[in-house]
Amino acid sequence: MLQQRTLKSISRAVGVGLHSGQRVELTLRPAPVDTGIVFRRVDLPEPVDIRMTAEAVTDTRLASTVSTGGAKVQTVEHLMSACAGLGIDNLYIDITADEVPILDGSASSFVFLLQSAGIELQKAPRRFIRVTRKVEVREGEGANEKWASLEPYHGYKLSFEIDFDHRVVNSTGQRVEFDLGTDSYSRDIARARTFGFTKEVEYMRSKGLALGGGLDNAIVMDDTKVLNAGGLRYDDEFVKHKILDAMGDLYIIGKPLLAAYTAFRSGHALNNKLLRELLAHSDAYEVVTFEDEKRAPRGFGEVARAW
């Protein structure tokens, strides 16, 4: 039987929010079977739990924000991506502010935190959402067109293409494919950092955003080059970060997907729209378990590989 997974012990981190610049303490704790992934705002007078569901997403400007009532948590996608990549089903995330710390701008620090705590197999079957027919969402036309789709696939595969008119991005490749069954999330995706341009950063800061961003937690470019002294971590780091984001956005659905995800210029808003489109059509998916691990897709039967 493919079993649900949580952590063996508690893991903690301290950082700053990318947009707020505010100090944030994060505590990752084991959770019982069928809990799902739950953010707990412990800084509020009465702690508030926000459980990950597609409907919990209430804002997708610059990041994915989840909320319930008046409580929210922003920029959840990198931590959710790490949970997806390592196959964590049940987790409590205590947080002392309304934004997940950006740490190094990728998911690698979250992978380290999760793996440091250890992964515990639980006595309950892991439930998957298996896509049974193609679902697609589109926006815009011509040069502004963007789209994302999910199709049936015995496993989990993501293909992403970006379209940035910048000499550095053009030279590194704008399309990548990642298959959870044959590739390593920790090695191939997790270290890809968020990126931005100096003009954008200046504008966002004038609006009170990106206050915690800098060269230590993002790739920053001017009109011609990367400004980070160490350069890129991957040749195709830009589009790999889009895969990282997509994995986090899609894992908000609350269960691992069995599907092929394909996207062109998609972002947080379109990814969430895709999840809602899927859930709106009961004939497009089914919830499955694997009593016989040999019948499970490759890559799901083993605890996530280390670095």
UniProtKB/Swiss-Prot annotation:
Keywords carried by this UniProt record: Hydrolase, Lipid A biosynthesis, Lipid biosynthesis, Lipid metabolism, Metal-binding, Zinc
GO cellular component: membrane
Biological source species: Variovorax paradoxus (strain S110)
Gene3D superfamilies the record matches: lpxc deacetylase, domain 1 (3.30.230.20), lpxc deacetylase, domain 2 (3.30.1700.10)
InterPro entries named among the record's database cross-references: Ribosomal_Su5_D2-typ_SF, UDP-acyl_GlcNac_deAcase, UDP-acyl_GlcNac_deAcase_C, UDP-acyl_N-AcGlcN_deAcase_N
GO molecular function, one term: metal ion binding
EC top class, as a word: hydrolase
Protein name: UDP-3-O-acyl-N-acetylglucosamine deacetylase
Organism taxonomic ancestry: Bacteria, Pseudomonadati, Pseudomonadota, Betaproteobacteria, Burkholderiales
Cofactor(s) needed: Zn(2+)
Active site: H268
Highest taxon above the source species: Bacteria
EC numbers: 3.5.1.108
Pathway: Glycolipid biosynthesis; lipid IV(A) biosynthesis; lipid IV(A) from (3R)-3-hydroxytetradecanoyl-[acyl-carrier-protein] and UDP-N-acetyl-alpha-D-glucosamine: step 2/6
